[in-house]
Each structure stands twice: as structure tokens, then as C-alpha cells.
Amino acid sequence: MGKKAILLLLSAVVLLASCANPQQRDNSLQCEKQTIDLPGVHNARQLGGYVIGDKKIRMDLLLRSGTLAKASDEAISALHDKYKLALVADFRSSMERSKAPDRDVEDAINVWLPVLEKKISGEKVDTVMAALHFNMDNPSYTVELLRQQNIQDALSTSYDAIVFDEDCRQSFADFLDSLVALPEGRAALWHCSHGKDRSGWGTAFLLAALGADRSLIVDDFSISNIPYTNEIEDLASIAREEGLEDELIEYIYLLRGVSAAFFEKTLDAIDSCYGSIDNFLEQELDLTADEKQILQDKFLE
């Protein structure tokens, strides 16, 4: 979706008054501090309160999560009433959306910005990634897959695929454009299926645009392991029982949670190719200095 289309869509939601929720003052980068109460929505949290330089991210405006498909009525009401949600950015594939469509939130637009569409459900589907993606509920089969070199290769480069694929970059560029166009005082929520990898990279690019340092970007990305601790530990336990080598356990984090190690490798690749993540934002996501300033003025205090 182009910048003009996003601007036209978002202009339709500016009719309601912006909310003025009390600002909570807490700097701690802890899962429980960032978690928001959205029953039925996995890994729901906000960026509000993060310290960037001598400023903080405003509370209750920037939300990230898993799919809204099973969001409760209470969650939908909170998104409308408390957060004054204006935008939902959905990074899932067409197949994921058709199997589990988001619930609608009144007065919010839902923008489809697919990341890894071709690899998961497109015409050039990557059978390796598809096998992993759609067999998440079969632990023994998953462990067997992890023994295969092609699976290991696909997993070890999965973050690179998210960042360096042209279509994925366009979706992230449109995501940042949508935040530039977001009405003042209104919230945005972005998600994929589980709110960890694709949502995590979208968050990383946003945090970088807001001026966050690398440690904050990595810490926020890593928080996604906490809501999925049980799933990670359960699969790791089964894997060890079935004799999976210790060095392959890291791949379980890529499947059930996130891998900070592989995340940082891709950040290193960005630095190597572009000099810095700021240069990547400018050269590949077409984020101008003026747009970056708009984001900082809008979301920092």
C-alpha cells in the first residue's frame, strides 16, 4: 500500500477526539511493565515508557501483539475505548489472514502489510519455511525437522529473509509511513501471528527511527521469549529426550520464541551492508529526516 493510500485511510479516523490518558512514569524494560491487558491476544505489550536519550516514548500509543483473531470483547473494547486505536498493521500472509481473520475494532483501519508472503503462502512458497510454519503443533516432527541441514539453513537465515527481501522491506516502509500519518493522540497496533519475529522487526525499525540504541532494540525483541517460555522449554525438553544436540537447541528459540543471537547477526549484517541501521531506514525504507522528526515529535516526550 502506497503512502497516499495510507494517508487517505488514516484521514478517515481523525474525526474522533484524541484521548488524553494519564501518563505512567516507569522506565523499567520488563515484560510485566510493558504488557497490556488484551484477553485473547498473545504477546500484547506497548513501547510506552522506553527511555530514548533524555526522552521517553509516550504511553498507550504504540502497541505490538499477536493476531487479533481470538481477541475477546473486552480486548476489542479496550482497544477502542482506552487506546483510541486508529490503525492495525497486519504483517501476516494471505493464508494466515484467511485462516484466522482479525476481529474488527471500531474506528480503526486494518492495513495488510505482508511480510514473507511469498515464502509462506505465495506463488514462490518456500517449502522448508512452510513445513515449519504449519507443523508447530507436532513436537516430535519438529525435532526431526531440526536435524535436517536445509531446515537449519532456512532457520539461520530467516531474519535475513525478513530484512533483505524487497517485498518485506516495502511492507516495513509502508508501516513507518502509516505511523507518520497517524492522527495525534491515537494509537497504532501492529502484529503478525505470534507477535514476535515479523512484529519484532517492525518494532526494531520503529525504535531505530525514534533514536533508540541497539541495546534497547535487542532487549525489546528478546522480551518475546517470556510469554512463550513454556512452549520453548517444553519443546527443548522433548528435543533433549530425543537426542537433539545442544547446539541445535538455539533453533527452538527461533521457532517458539525469538533468538537474540540470530537477531544481532542480522543487525550486524545491516551495519556491514549499510553502515548503520539509520542508513538502512533511509536507503531501503525511504524514511526521510523530516519523517523521522515527525515520528519523534509524535511519540516521544
Residue ranges, per PLM feature:
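Positively charged n-region of N-terminal signal peptides that target proteins for export
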Residues: 1-5
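Detector for intrinsically disordered, low-structure N-terminal pre-sequences
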Residues: 12-13, 124
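C-terminal motif of bacterial Sec signal peptides marking the signal peptidase cleavage site
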Residues: 14-18
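Cys-dependent protein tyrosine phosphatase-like superfamily
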Residues: 19-189, 201-301
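Ser/Thr-glycine-rich phosphate-binding loops at phosphate-binding pockets of nucleotides
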Residues: 194-199
